[in-house]
From Swiss-Prot:
Biased composition, class Acidic residues, residue ranges: 46-57
Modified residues (Phosphoserine): 279
Name of the featured protein: Uncharacterized protein KIAA0513
Signal peptide segment: none
Annotated Low complexity bias: 74-86
Keywords: Cytoplasm, Phosphoprotein
GO annotations of cellular component type: cytoplasm
Subcellular location(s) of the protein: Cytoplasm
Organism field: Homo sapiens (Human)
Record field: compositional bias (Basic and acidic residues): 258-272
Length: 411
């Protein structure tokens, strides 16, 4: 017995006459009404089984029950995604609001932080996604525009909060926020009374940031002409000379440098002789005590993995910030790579020197900070040697930085 041919239109229109099925085909598991909807007795699980069975038996996927099921599933998935994204947005907003308020409370110097706030701060900072640590570092950095000199209460709140975040950064290998906090350690300070030293140690300067900056200032003055020559007359030479220490020179031109200039302008006979660690004037007004002096023991400072990662990030940011081809729209990075192919040899040499100068300046800053945190000279030299090779520094640049480490280590 031959099976009658079924017009194609019947399959598409689903007319009242269903195509004759093969004797081997099993009947549909769920009967349908004339309008294509499922019977009243069908459950949700039966709906899923029906859709799967019909699809396996080769029926058209445009079947009404399949379309309804697919639309329902798609709507549920879209609704679920929207709900998840909405929840995540709310959590992110709550985290940012908390960190903003927490940092503002630290710098206000007013009411103390209660235990609930401290516990919530610790919870946010220990999260695996690192958002709490990131936003804390951002808001602390943003406070620099107000003042770098803080009250004693604010200072010790910062010490406690930094210790929590830096410990979690070390545990999670989260080096981005730690790099920003490292910079803040040399930014915020309070004026405190100097500690009286034993008579035998009064000849030796205290290990404050001022002593480090004095030493670096002296070293910088001696080597400025050499460093200027090393910058090799690139198009950005003036800019590089101005900041060839990647921010160190800015520190040197701060209040300490201005104070030194004022001292130099005074008559010679009125200048006090520096025979003790602190002059009477310094004892009256106190000295600058920076955050790093209380955070030297943080384990993250004592691993080269942090310094290597932080240095790479700092060099990348500096190149992006100071390179005319990448300043502005981030989409110009690809255009820069395309331009490289069309550069003359002289332009390529200038570009390479520009990158070398950035590496040289950042290495000066990083080795200075490493020594200030109490890292030994060998570790600093190992770091310098590795990064000098990667950055393609020449022998004279390498010797300048090695001499800098040697001089700072003896202070």
């Amino acid at each position: 017995m031959e099976t009658p041919e079924v017009p194609v239109g019947s399959l598409i229109d689903f007319g009242p006459e269903a195509p004759t099925s093969s004797p081997l085909e099993a009947p549909p598991p769920v009967l349908q009404d004339g309008d294509g909807s499922l019977g009243d007795g069908a459950s949700e699980s039966e709906t899923t089984e029906s859709a799967d069975s019909e699809n396996d038996m080769g029926e058209s996927p445009s079947h009404p029950s399949w379309d309804q099921d697919r639309r329902s599933s798609s709507n549920e998935s879209f609704s679920s995604n929207q709900s998840t994204e909405s929840t995540q947005d709310e959590e992110t907003l709550a985290l940012r609001d908390f960190m903003r308020g927490y940092v503002e409370k630290i710098f206000s110097g007013g009411e103390d932080l209660d235990q609930e706030e401290k516990a919530k701060f610790g919870e946010y900072c220990s999260s695996e996604n690192g958002k709490g640590r990131e936003w804390f570092a951002r808001y602390v950095s943003a406070q620099r525009c107000n003042s770098k000199c803080v009250s004693e209460a604010t200072f010790y709140r910062l010490v406690q909060s930094f210790a929590v975040v830096l410990f979690e950064c070390h545990q999670m290998d989260d080096f981005g926020p730690a790099k920003n906090l490292m910079t803040m350690c040399f930014t915020y300070y309070h004026i405190g009374k100097p500690q009286l030293l034993p008579p035998e140690s009064r000849e030796k300067p205290a290990g404050s940031i001022d002593s480090y900056l004095k030493s670096a200032n002296s070293w910088l003055a001696e080597k400025k002409d050499i460093a200027e020559r090393l910058l090799k007359n690139t198009s950005a030479r003036t800019e590089n000379v101005k900041g060839f220490f990647g921010g160190l020179e800015t520190k040197l031109k701060g209040p300490l440098a201005r104070r030194n200039e004022e001292d130099e302008n005074k008559p010679q006979e009125k200048r006090p002789r520096a025979v003790t660690a602190y002059s009477p004037e310094d004892e009256k007004k106190g000295e600058k005590i920076y955050l790093y002096t209380h955070l030297k023991q943080q384990p993250i400072w004592h691993t080269l993995r942090f310094w290597n990662a932080a240095f790479f990030d700092a060099v990348h940011c500096e190149r992006t910030k100071r390179s005319p081809t990448t300043r502005g729209d981030a989409g110009e990075e690809e255009e820069k790579r395309e331009k490289w192919c069309h550069m003359t040899q002289e332009e390529r040499d200038d570009s390479l020197r520009f990158n070398e100068n950035i590496t040289f300046g950042q290495l000066g800053t990083f080795t200075h900070n490493m020594l200030a945190f109490g890292l030994n000279k060998k570790l600093c030299n190992d770091f310098l040697k590795k990064q000098a090779v990667i950055g393609n520094l020449d022998e004279e640049q390498y010797k300048l930085l090695s001499d800098h480490i040697e001089q700072m280590a003896t202070e």
